[in-house]
Every structure is written in C-alpha cells, then in structure tokens.
C-alpha cells in the first residue's frame, strides 16, 4: 500500500524533504482564483486549431473520441503558459531548491488522465531523457483536479534520486517515452503517493524514480507540469538530439488520426 505523504507548507520543511527524499508537496500554492484562471487558459489553449501542430506536441487516446492525453511544449505556443512557468513564486521556490544557482524555466506541459483510463506511466527517471549534469533539475506539478492513488497520482520511490540514472528502455507508452529496465528491490525504497488537491504543487527531483497508475475514477486527473534546471547544469545535447530523433520515429509509427479537439475532451 503506497504511503500517503503529508508535508507542512513550511519552506525549510519543503526544501529538506526535496533534498533528502527527492520530492515535496506545497499545499494551496495557487489560490482558488488563480487556479480558475489557469483552468480557463488550459481550455482556451485546447480549443484552438491544432492542425498545424508539430509531431509530439499533442498525444491522444486510442479511443473513439480521440481524447487528449498529453499536451507538450505549451510554452512555445502560448504567451500565457510561457509567463506562468516564470511566475515569481515558482521561480523563488525552485531557486531555493538549487541553493546558490539561478533557476531556468524549460517548459510547460499538460497530462490529462481521462476517467477510467487504464494505462500507466511506468517507473522511470526524468533525467534518462533530459540529460542534465549535474542533475540539478526539478519537475513542478500543479494539480488542476484532485490527484489521488485512485486517480493515478505521481508515486515516487523515496530517496531514489541519490543513486544516479539506472538503465532505461523504450516504454511503448504514448506520453512516457522511457521506463526502467528493471526495478530496484522493493525493500530498498518506500513508495510514496503524492496526493494533491486542486491548487497544490508537487516537486520531484529529475533523478527520482516515479510512476503514475491508472485513473480508476469517473473524473479527469489533469496535472500541469513545469520543468526547471539550475544555471550550473549542462545538457548533453548529443544524447538529447539522438533521443528526440528516436522519439519522433516512435510517435510517427504509433499515432495517427484526427487532430481535432473539443472542450469536452479536455
């Protein structure tokens, strides 16, 4: 049974949890008013014509409705989301995690688990495809809906961010490109579910092992994700370019069909 992870909204507690455990939760970081604005902007973003979108910008479910699963690189197509990922409160928080280095915003994306979605994002480490050295990078996730063990919340292996990158392989899952070749021993790390209410934010280290399960509820589970790295980190551009080429081939083979999307799909 995954451990439910509580944390007080205290800066030092959050930073200590992130550094020692590889993750943390900040409750009510976005007010109800701020959250409604973000939700409205998400709906506006998804209502536009996406027929000219680049391969991989949008991932759809393989169902009759072609429901949206993922929207990547939102900051490249929206001034609002480009600005939101640089929101001062987010930058200040991330900068605290990095210590004496500046926080650099990399991107914004939406992950939407539709009601009763059966798929899982397998266990993986983000740095298996981000390639940061040193691994001073973080995923910041804003809950637009309740995110629980039942709806497919992020589950982290506590302390796994300290061991470096393990061997990965193609996952075969649209929206989650890589997965661990083999899992660490069950007794080595505790599973911790990052349960979130709308407006809460989670932080997970780029090296922490994590996954998400199926959505067993009748509701959407939407998470808006932002990625950051520190000014002292460098990206292996050769490895990233090869990864992006491989991913493009996989997406081309795996997904085709309609690029239409209505508000009811999101």
Regions found by a protein language model. Give the residues of each.
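Non-heme Fe(II)-dependent double-stranded beta-helix
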Residues: 1-21, 27-123, 129-131, 168-169, ...
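Non-heme Fe(II)/2-oxoglutarate
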Residues: 48, 53-60, 201-203, 207-266
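Active-site region of the double-stranded beta-helix
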Residues: 100-103, 127-130, 135, 142-153, ...
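A structural signal for short, well-ordered beta-strand segments
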Residues: 107-108, 140-142, 224-228
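Glycine-rich phosphate/pyrophosphate-binding beta-alpha loops
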Residues: 126-128, 137, 210-215
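A generic structural micro-feature
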Residues: 131-136, 186, 218-220
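Extracellular structured ligand-interaction cores
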Residues: 135-139, 151, 191-193, 221-223
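Double-stranded beta-helix
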Residues: 147-211, 233-236
């Amino acid at each position: 049974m995954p451990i439910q992870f509580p944390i007080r909204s205290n800066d030092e507690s959050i930073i200590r949890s992130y550094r020692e455990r590889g993750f943390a939760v900040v409750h009510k970081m976005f007010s109800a008013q701020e959250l409604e604005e973000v939700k409205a902007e998400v709906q506006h973003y998804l209502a536009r014509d996406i027929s000219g979108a680049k391969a991989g910008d949008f991932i759809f479910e393989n169902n009759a409705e072609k429901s949206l699963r993922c929207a990547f690189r939102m900051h490249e197509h929206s001034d609002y989301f480009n600005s939101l990922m640089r929101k001062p409160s987010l930058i200040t928080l991330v900068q605290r995690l990095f210590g004496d280095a500046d926080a650099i915003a990399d991107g914004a994306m939406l992950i939407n688990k539709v009601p009763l979605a059966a798929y899982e994002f397998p266990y993986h480490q983000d740095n298996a495809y981000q390639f940061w050295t040193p691994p001073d990078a973080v995923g910041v996730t804003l809950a637009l809906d309740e995110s629980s063990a039942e709806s497919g919340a992020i589950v982290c292996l506590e302390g796994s961010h300290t061991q470096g990158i393990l061997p990965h392989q193609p996952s075969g899952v649209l929206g989650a490109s890589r997965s661990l070749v083999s899992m660490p021993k069950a007794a080595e790390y505790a599973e911790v579910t990052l349960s979130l209410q709308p407006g809460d934010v989670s932080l997970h280290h780029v090296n922490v092992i994590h996954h998400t399960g199926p959505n067993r509820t009748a509701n959407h589970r939407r998470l808006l994700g932002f990625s950051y790295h520190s000014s002292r980190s460098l990206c292996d551009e050769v490895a990233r370019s090869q990864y992006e080429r491989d991913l493009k081939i996989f997406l081309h083979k795996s997904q085709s069909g309609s690029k239409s999307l209505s508000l009811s799909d999101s």
